[in-house]
Amino acid sequence: MPRRSPADPAAALAPRRTTLPGGLRVVTEFLPAVHSASVGVWVGVGSRDEGATVAGAAHFLEHLLFKSTPTRSAVDIAQAMDAVGGELNAFTAKEHTCYYAHVLGSDLPLAVDLVADVVLNGRCAADDVEVERDVVLEEIAMRDDDPEDALADMFLAALFGDHPVGRPVIGSAQSVSVMTRAQLQSFHLRRYTPERMVVAAAGNVDHDGLVALVREHFGSRLVRGRRPVAPRKGTGRVNGSPRLTLVSRDAEQTHVSLGIRTPGRGWEHRWALSVLHTALGGGLSSRLFQEVRETRGLAYSVYSALDLFADSGALSVYAACLPERFADVMRVTADVLESVARDGITEAECGIAKGSLRGGLVLGLEDSSSRMSRLGRSELNYGKHRSIEHTLRQIEQVTVEEVNAVARHLLSRRYGAAVLGPHGSKRSLPQQLRAMVG
């Protein structure tokens, strides 16, 4: 798709947005220095939109749609992308699903054709359902065998309980084993509606040309479906208290995740929370990394994580250590968390954390794929584009006083925790951990 020479070069570099009939949005960002183009169809539906009886449906469907369409087999789809040296893939998260392609700019029409065909026309054929069911069950088994992956799911379940955010994106072996073709087809029909979809592209792309391609390949699907958009599952307050979960497993290491519930991504102190997370365990100079690993050598892997959803979130700490060092790791971790809750972080720590966030943000947007992802996520989450400059200003405006107020507010909350390792009972776990969970 050749680009027209713009009268205003600065305007040509600004992201553009078009809303088509039915609510489907097209957002693009032209990057003059690249030859590639990345395009993704972002659907505002994820694992939290599933009922308990179809847990894992969003992820199962994502797999299934690639198996065949009325005009292409799975091999046809793969060969078409391989023939141009591109990448075609998808992923499912708690609140969205994305189908994307990365190609040369000249091959963008093919990429849009393939992605649209998969998203709109995937057949969910009976034979395909059974084959892909086995693939997903293997993926679940592989995830269960990875302590870090398994623990991540265990932790969110311990923190959020029966709330949909607490369920694994991938579902369970039990739910996937009994899921029917009819349930998957219904999920596709009711959830993959144009008002939930964003087509995002970045790189060597022309906005008007992409809009024309979307009109061509989405066609009649651009109008609203006959059924109303199903409401999001699990919005609002999380019921129940965080808890402690233990999976006893014969392993060389003990793996632990513990953390607290936080407000969602729309919280006014969202960036102060990110600074707090970074100062706690987001880098090599963070409190936890320095105290647990560098000073005492108690663990190789120790870090914090921050997961933010529409209406809730989780700030967590992960560590893996020899079982005989578990009590010491928990003692030091508890001391760090209590110290930060009581005394806060220093001005210097705040400055380092802000610099880390700024640098990570900019360095993470050096290619068309990451730019496309930012466009799609921003449109789904906020209904508009949030520029990098806007985010950098938000980070810069964070003060150490705001961070420490957030720490006092959140770190005194009741913790949820998950432990995986060679421990026979919860009573055998370190007292510091049991005290934090309450």
Swiss-Prot record:
Residue numbers annotated as active site: 62
UniProt EC number: 3.4.24.-
UniProt record, GO biological process: proteolysis
InterPro entries: Metalloenz_LuxS/M16 (IPR011249), MPP/UQCRC_Complex (IPR050361), Pept_M16_N (IPR011765), Pept_M16_Zn_BS (IPR001431), Peptidase_M16_C (IPR007863)
Cofactor: Zn(2+)
Coiled-coil residue spans: none
Keywords: Hydrolase, Metal-binding, Metalloprotease, Protease, Zinc
GO cellular component terms, A-Z: plasma membrane
Phosphoprotein among keywords: no
Free-text comment on the cofactor: Binds 1 zinc ion per subunit.
GO molecular function: metal ion binding; metalloendopeptidase activity
Binding site for Zn(2+): 59, 63, 139
Enzyme class label: hydrolase
Similarity comment: Belongs to the peptidase M16 family.
Entry protein name: Uncharacterized zinc protease Rv2782c
Species the sequence originates in: Mycobacterium tuberculosis (strain ATCC 25618 / H37Rv)
Taxonomic lineage of the native organism: Bacteria, Bacillati, Actinomycetota, Actinomycetes, Mycobacteriales
